């Protein structure tokens, strides 16, 4: 696709919802490696967030960790505003925050249902709306969805799949709103990826590997590399798309 030398994000500023672990941390480090200043939100571990900042700064980059719950619209807006106040601009938004609640239909609580929508859908809209206030031509928005929008090979995942399906429509609609301003928005749909929240071992993981042509989980660095391409100038003609990176999970 492309290499480190052809993706240049110097003088760009990125904000990542959910950047202290897993895919989000990999994206934060990857964008910083290509020259972007990176701010990211996190909700739990101060230590983990500080480590991501330390790793980026040790490599010569600039990073800012902001504690903010993506279920809180005001907190997300404030985090984006703080990013701009700190770095002077905003060019890239990555909506990576998400929750996965799985339970039998009869047992799935309305509290879990509402929180799934608040984080997986509403926060994407809120952050995109706020970020668009600051973005100029060449701005990039990336939503991290899931191939579960298209395929759910396990029980109990209906609300999660619904929330990720919503991002497909939201991405298409916002592409119409933002396109005339030269801002692109795309939806990246990872398949199973090896993270601390979704480890690539155990019976559940093996059941998923068995239906995948590549027979393995993805790596968070692979998702980060794809995102880095999509936010680069080279991807300027891609918008409104939902793009799977899933080892053939949805084939």
Regions found by a protein language model. Give the residues of each.
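Active-site helix of classical SDR
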Residues: 128, 163, 171
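Conserved glycine-rich cofactor-binding loop
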Residues: 13, 20-21
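A conserved structural motif in NAD(P)-dependent oxidoreductases
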Residues: 212-223, 234
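Alpha-helical segment proximal to the catalytic Tyr-Lys
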Residues: 133, 176-180, 236
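Substrate-binding pocket helix/loop in short-chain dehydrogenase/reductase
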Residues: 104-105, 112-114, 208
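Short C-terminal tail/terminal secondary-structure segment
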Residues: 2-5, 151, 228, 239-251
């Amino acid at each position: 696709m492309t290499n480190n030398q052809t993706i240049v994000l110097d003088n760009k500023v990125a904000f990542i919802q959910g950047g202290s672990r897993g895919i989000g941390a990999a994206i934060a480090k990857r964008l910083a490696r290509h020259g972007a200043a990176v701010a990211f939100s996190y909700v739990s571990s101060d230590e983990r967030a500080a480590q991501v900042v330390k790793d980026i700064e040790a490599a010569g980059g600039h990073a800012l960790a902001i504690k903010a719950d993506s279920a809180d619209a005001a907190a997300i807006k404030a985090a984006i505003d703080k990013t701009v106040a700190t770095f002077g601009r905003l060019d890239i938004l990555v909506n990576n925050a998400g929750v996965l609640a799985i339970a039998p239909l009869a047992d799935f609580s309305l509290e879990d249902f509402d929180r799934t929508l608040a984080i997986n859908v509403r926060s994407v809209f809120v952050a995109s709306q706020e970020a668009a206030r600051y973005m100029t031509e060449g701005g990039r928005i990336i939503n991290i969805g899931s191939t579960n929008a298209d395929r759910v090979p396990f029980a109990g995942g209906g609300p999660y799949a619904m929330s990720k399906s919503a991002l497909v429509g939201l991405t298409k609609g916002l592409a119409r709103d933002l396109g005339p301003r030269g801002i692109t928005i795309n939806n990246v749909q990872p398949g199973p990826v090896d993270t601390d929240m979704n480890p690539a071992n155990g019976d559940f993981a093996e059941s998923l590997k068995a239906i995948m042509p590549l027979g393995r989980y993805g790596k968070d660095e692979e998702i980060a590399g794809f995102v880095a391409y999509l936010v680069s100038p080279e991807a300027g003609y891609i918008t409104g798309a939902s793009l799977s990176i899933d080892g053939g999970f949805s084939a």
